[in-house]
């Protein structure tokens, strides 16, 4: 941290900060938008220390844009100080996110022609205040420096610079001060009183048609008494008259009856020739060059930094370091050779001065989201796509194997396996237990079967999942028979006995089934499958059999054979139904 006591500052240093008093060719203007802690990690710093409040001010230094330049070298193009900002007092626990800044612009006048390429140095200083400060002290907080390229009269240029823990946002521009004009402020506009053309070596000013443009060197001390309005000089002790004036001091108006340097015939009867178009009309010289008429042609006087017949070639070389943001300069070191900047991928422009919005080119395919990380681009792909630019479509079954007879299914931006019965998981490698969810209600026992699952219902319940209760009186034990099969009303009294016989037959069949299972020997108590070779009764066929019993006059037998039923190992009488399970277990990959 640089710390200087104001009392010890030499007068020469303070005078170096002040604006020069000579008539400037133009003014460089700087606008500070914000200064504060940067976006990096950590707690934001306070510009003041523990000794009390402080306030900020800025110093601007302009130097020629050379490739190697010592920080201590003089500000050859000019320097200036801003006003002091409002007093800032640190508040504990409150981050210094927005610091109070000085009002107005920082102006740096320049005397010579504007170079176009220059070095800009901005210093942020702190003035410590308060009783404990032991006298005001200036401390350098931050310093940013960089090369810039800017033409006089161009729009405001914005920039952001970071140094240490601080971040500075600012704008800058260069403009000519009247009577200077042009991209380099190398030409002057002088007033003329006569409506005729400007004299030799002069041309009308573009922004001021009633004035004449002359080389800036015409500020040379002219002959004593030379009219400042109608005369000018290119060398000391000269006095050249503007058109319409004559005399040694350009104070005598030319008679309207005389003819001046004319090219075309005037109106009939005047005997004079009126001015015609000249080779310098329209300013054929680029980049602020000045045009001079020669016999049948013209010559361009180019400002510093440009050359060529029309000043169209930049005289800046790679030795001047014209490429910004890491650009590679290609060109010879000869002052008469031009240069080309090869920019890194993130920047563009003749001097690599503009950042490229690389995501605007939409490099990510198939709806991927582009992320510009500064040093590289990254694409965030949608489901089903992959690759650096999301160019690979993964919505297919290539290379995807489903085990245990499973089938790969495409769709929805993903792949999945449709598994065979008894298997599940991502690749159908996991065995699936259809009884794991306990599908049998009211205490029914579940058995796995090759065609599905089977529920063995507890006494008093029936149905595919044992969901129906059998009432003791038989009122709603089974669905009613179709209307066409009902007997006459006189036979309805036979229904209760028939239901009683049906219940007895069911109990007898269950007992026979239990005896048959016990006689089968080993393997009968697996609890996971039915006996092979048995016929699975359907929940639909059982009510039909019961209803057929109702059509008889109380007579009828139960099931024809106990071999027609499955026999789980259970001491209770249970009703058994085969439940077709889904043929596949599908799980998304």
From Swiss-Prot:
Instruction: Write down the membrane topology.
Output: Single-pass type I membrane protein
Mapped to this chain, the residue ranges on the Extracellular side of the membrane are 33-494
Q: Which Gene3D superfamilies does the annotation name?
A: 2.60.40.3510, Laminin
Describe how it is modified after translation: Ubiquitinated by MIB (MIB1 or MIB2), leading to its endocytosis and subsequent degradation.
Cytoplasmic-side segments? 516-589
Subunit-level organization: Can bind and activate Notch-1 or another Notch receptor.
Any notes on this protein's domains? The DSL domain is required for binding to the Notch receptor.
Role of this protein? Inhibits primary neurogenesis. May be required to divert neurons along a specific differentiation pathway. Plays a role in the formation of somite boundaries during segmentation of the paraxial mesoderm.
Name it.
Delta-like protein 3
* Source organism of this protein record: Rattus norvegicus
């Amino acid at each position: 941290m640089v710390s200087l006591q104001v009392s010890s500052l030499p007068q020469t240093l303070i005078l170096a900060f002040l604006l020069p008093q000579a008539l400037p060719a133009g003014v460089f203007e700087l606008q500070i938008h914000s200064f504060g802690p940067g976006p990096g990690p950590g707690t934001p710093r306070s510009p003041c220390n523990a000794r009390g409040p402080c306030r900020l001010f800025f110093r601007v230094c302009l130097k020629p844009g050379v490739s190697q330049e010592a920080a201590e070298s003089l500000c050859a193009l000019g320097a200036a100080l801003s006003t002091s900002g409002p007093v800032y007092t640190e508040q504990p626990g409150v981050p210094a996110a927005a610091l109070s800044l000085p009002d107005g612009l920082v102006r740096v006048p320049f005397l010579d022609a504007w170079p176009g390429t220059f070095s800009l140095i901005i210093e942020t200083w702190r003035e410590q205040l308060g009783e404990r400060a032991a006298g005001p002290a200036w401390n350098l907080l931050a310093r940013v420096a960089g090369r810039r390229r800017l033409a006089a009269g161009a729009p405001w240029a914005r920039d952001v610079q970071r140094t240490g823990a601080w971040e500075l946002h600012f704008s800058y521009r260069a403009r000519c001060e009247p009577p200077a004009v042009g991209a380099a402020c190398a030409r002057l506009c002088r007033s003329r009183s006569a409506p005729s053309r400007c004299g030799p070596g002069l041309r009308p000013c573009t922004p001021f048609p009633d004035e004449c443009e002359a080389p800036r060197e015409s500020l040379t001390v002219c002959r004593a008494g030379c009219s400042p309005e109608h005369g000018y000089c290119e060398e000391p002790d000269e006095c050249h008259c503007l058109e319409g004036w004559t005399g040694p001091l350009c104070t005598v108006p030319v008679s309207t009856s005389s003819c001046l340097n004319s090219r075309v015939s005037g109106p009939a009867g005047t005997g004079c020739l009126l001015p015609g178009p000249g080779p310098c009309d329209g300013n054929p010289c680029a980049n602020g060059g000045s045009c001079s008429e020669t016999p049948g042609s013209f010559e361009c006087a180019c400002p510093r930094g440009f050359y060529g017949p029309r000043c169209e070639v930049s005289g800046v070389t790679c030795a001047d370091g014209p490429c910004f943001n890491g650009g590679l300069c290609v060109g010879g070191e000869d002052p008469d050779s031009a240069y080309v900047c090869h920019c890194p991928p993130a920047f563009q422009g003749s001097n690599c001065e503009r950042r490229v919005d690389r995501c605007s080119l939409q490099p990510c395919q198939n709806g991927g989201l582009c992320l510009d990380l500064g040093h590289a681009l990254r694409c965030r792909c949608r489901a089903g796509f992959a690759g650096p630019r999301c160019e690979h479509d993964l919505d297919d079954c290539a290379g995807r194997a489903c085990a245990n007879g499973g089938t790969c299914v495409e769709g929805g931006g993903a792949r999945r396996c449709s598994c065979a019965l008894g298997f599940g998981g991502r690749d159908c490698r996991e065995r699936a237990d259809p009884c794991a969810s306990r599908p049998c209600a009211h205490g029914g026992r579940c058995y796995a079967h090759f065609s599905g699952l089977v529920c063995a219902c507890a006494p008093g319940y029936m149905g595919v999942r044992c969901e129906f209760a059998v009432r003791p009186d038989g009122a709603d034990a089974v669905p009613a028979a179709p209307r066409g099969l009902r007997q006459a009303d006189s036979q309805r009294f036979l229904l209760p006995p028939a239901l009683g016989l049906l219940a007895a037959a069911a109990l007898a069949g269950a007992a026979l089934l239990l005896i048959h299972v016990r006689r089968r020997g080993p393997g009968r108590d697996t609890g996971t499958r039915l006996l092979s070779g048995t016929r699975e009764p359907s929940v639909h066929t059982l009510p039909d059999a019961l209803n057929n019993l109702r059509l008889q006059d109380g007579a009828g037998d139960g099931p024809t054979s106990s071999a027609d039923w499955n026999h789980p190992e259970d001491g209770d009488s249970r009703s058994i139904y085969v439940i077709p399970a889904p043929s596949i277990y599908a799980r998304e990959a």
